[in-house]
């Protein structure tokens, strides 16, 4: 029995065809994955199914009285409001315990959700147990890890009792164990009769997926059962250095100003506590020119460790930490430190105004601000333009951040991190949202920058294949402790 049918579904944006006459049928009991390269319209496709995106053609969803709501979409990023009912969070707020108190707790958030739906109250208990949320009830939303936040948003969606649960890259940013756990609980959800449609990569197809709809750059699609779909292993080792403009890269990096320091980072017996211990007695040295991989499961303390290095965490002053040869708290400002670092994180774009355009996001890296709040001169404009050309994103200069796909947002933020040619690059999941080709290209750039420009690198990824070949040092965290 067909439960969802699409006939010649077409989406056009700004004169460009994103989806071109897509037709398919979803039958009772089927679970679908949507794959395709960056920019092929995967997120647009999900929004069309929910009615959030205008389309031509026909979409028919069979009514089912067991499910009060037809379709619910969980987007890749979620925007929370604080207790003041605004969204004016700032990036460092999660590391400032007093300011973080303006964010609601997990329990308060869920109570608000069920207050609008009496029937949902009966569902909360088993969902909270299934998704292991009860232990998170006292936690502030702004302090949740990627995996914790993803579980919370899925529970919220399921409390609406949808017939179709749509997920946009649900495994992005999750470690191996968290991905396996989420896959298992989604299978349990599917067994309840809910149909799952998720955007993911062909290399991350969950075991319960029955059909794959693959989108292409020209807006067309192909449909296959999983037994005929390719569950390929991603190989990103080769890179795409042949397509890299080496002359421009050397102009922007090798010929720039050199900073001299023996150690970028020196910390001894560092401990960070809030309600509980986040980092426990960490000792770590990063010498000039070293390239490090920082790994560990979700919630192991990686983001907190990076916040100490990037001058975002005030607990640095209570610990024995030296950055670029100076002890924290001896007179240097956070801006003195940030001048020497280029930083990317999975959630950084959430703190920019959506109306900021791609050029201004990249240019803000010159001043380490979340937005461009001053005029820049012609030389600076040329510099930003060249970096965007190098990353092949010059076509995004005038487009607003909210108009960009997740992968395009990520590339603009990479330009922001690189634009001032800093001696230390701190890249936290920089390839999140990029397709295989973009990831290989970015790895090639990082390798070339670090080797030719003698850069110091701290690189975080849950995927070993995403780590650049120039990385030779490794640190691993687990439960706040260094285990490697």
Model regions: which residues?
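Catalytic Walker B motif of ABC-type/P-loop ATPase nucleotide-binding domains
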Residues: 165-169, 425-429
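ABC ATPase nucleotide-binding domain signature region
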Residues: 46-115, 306-370
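Conserved beta-strand-loop-alpha-helix hinge in the C-terminal portion
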Residues: 208, 215-248, 469, 473-484
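Conserved ABC ATPase signature
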Residues: 140-144, 148, 373-376, 400-404, ...
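The feature captures the beta-strand-to-loop junction immediately N-terminal to the Walker
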Residues: 35-37, 295-297
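Conserved ABC ATPase "signature" region
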Residues: 119-136, 363, 378-396
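Hydrophobic anchor residue at the start of the ABC signature
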Residues: 154, 414
